[in-house]
Every structure is written in structure tokens, then in C-alpha cells.
């Protein structure tokens, strides 16, 4: 009887810790390059238009699309080097006449609103997710001006 209570208690405790450990893995490690620097390096390669960047599984996943196809680049957050790439399905087409994504991201970083964990074009605007002090914040920005929507 005691063993059943202990097993249930341990199982409940492990279940409660799961979201915390998953959340902790979604933030670039200390000493990482700023996302704006990562994006600027990808932009300089002229592979296409960057449609999103997300920190996941220890890498920045940067999606780049040209007229023919899209690919995801997996970039080490500390060194900024590309570790691998793969073809992927196209998403929404980015609006024309937008600011470079690295420029918009750099302006957000300069405001000190938190650590950017994701940035993507969605429904004609730029969606940015940040983390600071255990809180998650989402911004919607005009991709042409970088101003909040």
C-alpha cells in the first residue's frame, strides 16, 4: 500500500517537472550569438528570403525560401556555423517590400524585452516570441516598418 502512494507521488512529481525541463531547452545557451547576427550571416549568403527563425533542440532553425523551394538551416547558436540543412515545405509567402529580418530582430534585441526564441511571418505580419524572467511574450510587428501592430 505504501509503495503505491510513493509511486503515485513520484509519478506526479515527474509529470510536473516535464514542462519546466521542456521550457528550459527552448532558450539559447549562455554565450550564444544574438539572433540578429545569425540572421545577418544567412542573409549575406543570398539563399533567398528568410521566413522564420526558431530556437529548437539546441539549434537555430532558419527557414529560407527562394522562387523554387524552401530549406531549413540548422545553426549552432554559439559559433554561428551551419551544422546541416534540409528541404522543407514552403509557408506563407513573405510580403514584398519588407525590412531585412536581421534589422527588425536587432531593434527588438536593443530594447531588452527578452530573449527571442522565435520569429516568423504569419498572416501578413511578423510574429516574435520572447522569454524573460520565466514569462513568455508575443509581439506582432509590421514587417515593412518594424512597428507594433
Annotate each language-model stretch with its function.
Residues 52-55, 87, 118-121:
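Hydrophobic/anchoring residues in structured secondary elements
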Residues 65-110:
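Mid-chain, structured segments of secreted extracytoplasmic proteins
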Residues 33, 45-48, 57-59, 68-70, ...:
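Extracytoplasmic
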Residues 11-12, 22:
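Cleavable N-terminal signal peptides
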Residues 60-63, 75, 80, 122, ...:
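Conserved histidines in hydrophobic membrane contexts and catalytic metal-binding motifs
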Residues 2-10:
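Bacterial N-terminal signal peptides that target proteins for export
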Residues 26-50, 93-115:
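Short, non-transmembrane alpha-helical segments in secretory-pathway proteins
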Amino acid at each position: 500500500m505504501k509503495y503505491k502512494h510513493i509511486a503515485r507521488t513520484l509519478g506526479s512529481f515527474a509529470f510536473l517537472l516535464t514542462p519546466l525541463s521542456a521550457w528550459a531547452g527552448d532558450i539559447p545557451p549562455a554565450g550564444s550569438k544574438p539572433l540578429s547576427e545569425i540572421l545577418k550571416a544567412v542573409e549575406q549568403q543570398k539563399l533567398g528570403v528568410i521566413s522564420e527563425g526558431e530556437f529548437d533542440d539546441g539549434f537555430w532553425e532558419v527557414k529560407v525560401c527562394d522562387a523554387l523551394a524552401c530549406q531549413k538551416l540548422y545553426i549552432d547558436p554559439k559559433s554561428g556555423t551551419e551544422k546541416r540543412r534540409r528541404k522543407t515545405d514552403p509557408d506563407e509567402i513573405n510580403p514584398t517590400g519588407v525590412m531585412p529580418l536581421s534589422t527588425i530582430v536587432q531593434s527588438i534585441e536593443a530594447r531588452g524585452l527578452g530573449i527571442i526564441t522565435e520569429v516568423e511571418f504569419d498572416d501578413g505580419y511578423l510574429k516574435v516570441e520572447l522569454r524573460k524572467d520565466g514569462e513568455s511574450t508575443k509581439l506582432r510587428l509590421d514587417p515593412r516598418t518594424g512597428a507594433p501592430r
